[in-house]
């Protein structure tokens, strides 16, 4: 399984510097299940609406291809106790969402270094495709 946070999913909707590298990275792993948090739906749709209402359909199309982790009590409790304590609240929710699906294996894709460091800290592979090319 591959967990994409909002910063990664957004690059699949709006062309940014790392978008093509990320799209290729995802295509190369077409047998893997892609997932994200219900939080991403809210963050992505708000960002798409703010950028341009024309991007909302593309955002919805990408979200439809992802398995969505619900924001349930397990995820919220995991976020409340996530380490390091310096991790921002929304990033802690992403980390808890990822670990609820990927307890000891899997990959987190993000363009937030603090989240990637925290994911590595709990034993997950953490990648930022195209960021260091």
Regions found by a protein language model. Name each.
Residues 1-36, 48-60, 124, 132:
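Short, well-structured N-terminal submotif of metal-dependent ribonuclease cores
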Residues 1, 37, 41, 69, ...:
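Acidic, PIN/NYN-like endoribonuclease modules and their adjacent C-terminal/linker elements
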Residues 64-96:
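Acidic catalytic patch
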Residues 21, 43, 78, 117-118:
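Phosphate- and divalent-cation-binding pockets in alpha/beta enzyme and binding domains
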Residues 19, 41, 56-59, 76, ...:
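A general structural signal for well-ordered alpha-helical segments in protein cores
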Residues 5, 91, 112:
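Acidic active-site catalytic centers that drive phospho-/nucleotidyl reactions
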Residues 8, 14, 46, 94-97, ...:
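Hydrophobic side chains within alpha-helical segments
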């Amino acid at each position: 399984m591959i967990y994409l946070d909002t910063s990664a999913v957004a690059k699949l909707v709006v062309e940014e510097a790392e978008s093509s590298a990320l799209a290729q990275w995802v295509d190369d792993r077409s047998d893997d299940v892609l997932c994200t948090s219900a939080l991403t739906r809210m963050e992505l749709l708000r960002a798409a609406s703010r950028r341009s209402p024309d991007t909302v359909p593309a955002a919805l199309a990408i979200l439809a291809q992802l398995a969505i982790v619900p924001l349930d009590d397990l995820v919220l409790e995991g976020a409340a106790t996530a380490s390091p304590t310096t991790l921002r609240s929304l990033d802690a929710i992403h980390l808890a969402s990822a670990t609820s699906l990927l307890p000891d294996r899997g990959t987190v894709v993000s363009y937030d270094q603090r989240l990637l460091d925290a994911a590595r800290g709990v034993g997950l592979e953490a990648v930022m495709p195209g960021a260091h090319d």
